[in-house]
Regions:
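Short, contiguous acidic and Ser/Thr-rich linear segments
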Residues: 46-62
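Amphipathic, non-transmembrane alpha-helical segments in extracytoplasmic/periplasmic proteins
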Residues: 1, 59-73, 121-122
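Acidic, small/polar residue-enriched beta-strand/turn segments
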Residues: 1-21, 36-50, 77-154
């Protein structure tokens, strides 16, 4: 999942995890501003937490990302990409219900906005295969039969 808005420090240079909230271009973040973090875990459980920008000059975007990772029990990766967008990745395999919403309350009158966080890359369905040890060698077999059931290892 990737945020729709790229934030910068000067209108061109992307923010980093180490960027203080006060340094996000045009955001006007103030100490005491809050960001509501709402999410759905891999298995569909709902989560919610409030992140407070204690000191806009020293609280960083990385602090927010750490709070996101903590809220999901370390089962997600949360980063800033090269364009200054929040990216969250489910670290668990299989079909995922992962969602993340950041609601910037801007109590101090600012306009901080990370945008909506949408699916960027969907995983694919798993293959119905079995791996086993056959005579001390790895054997990988498809569990279905017929010409339509195959796979390639490259």
């Amino acid at each position: 999942r990737r945020a729709s808005i790229a934030n910068t420090v000067d209108g061109n240079t992307a923010i980093l995890a180490s960027t203080a909230f006060a340094d996000i271009f045009g955001a006007g973040s103030q100490s005491g501003d809050t960001i509501r973090i709402n999410g759905t875990t891999h298995d569909g459980s709902t989560l919610s937490r409030v992140f407070t920008i204690e000191d806009a000059a020293t609280t960083t975007v990385g602090d927010l990302l750490s709070e996101v990772r903590s809220m999901f029990g370390g089962n997600v990766s949360a980063n800033i990409d090269s364009e200054g967008r929040v990216v969250i990745t489910d670290n668990q395999v299989g079909s995922s219900n992962l969602t993340l919403t950041l609601i910037e309350e801007n109590e101090g009158g600012g306009s901080l906005n990370f945008g909506s966080i949408e699916v960027e890359t969907e995983g694919r369905l798993g293959l119905d295969i079995t791996a086993s040890n056959r005579d001390n060698r790895l054997a990988i077999e498809h569990n279905g039969f017929g010409d339509r059931n195959g796979f390639t290892i490259s």
